Amino acid sequence: MKKFLSSLVMTILLSSCAVDKKKLTENVGKYDPPNIDDTSFKNSVITSKNFDETWTSVVDFVNDSFFKIEKLDKDSGLLTLSFSSKEAEKFIDCGDFEYTLFFTGEEFKGSYIDYAKSGLLAVLEAKMNINIQKIDNKSSKISINTNYTYSTQHALGYYDPKLNQTYSFVSGGHQTINVINPISGSIPTRTCKSTNFAENAIFNLIK
């Protein structure tokens, strides 16, 4: 009986090792895209401040923030801002990612942005257009549209534009692309969307 139990335990251990070895013959991973079904974002609001108050509040805020003013025209109520950030996760959401490298055993589990930041040398750039319009002497309307560009490089150690990929989307929007050489076990696409953090920073100011 003891010999039988010993043989059974050994068989289980060997089987377990065989499974582990099989799993590590290639890089494997998993990707979960962000939720793109949330369509509650509105790109315009009406405030109880008049035009001058709203304009001054917005300009003062952006002058002391991460935004850079590209163009400013009070007569037309238009502001064009730009921004880029090493903390892309504040402004966009690209889902969650994990992998195990068979050669080194290295593992990663976290946001796709954290992975792309170091693994794909990702860069976020955005341009925001703000339009402030007078409704009457006591209220105004502010509309915001932002164009996001999130660029990744799939060639490490050298530059090859053919291996660069870019996500382009607007406020409240998203883009899904087929990525170059998706890791085994993951879906072939990646999705990035706006978190509306930048837009809400303006909207919350004038509410």
Region annotations inferred by a language model:
Residues 1-17:
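Sec-dependent bacterial lipoprotein signal peptides
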Residues 18-207:
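Ser/Thr-rich, low-complexity intrinsically disordered terminal regions
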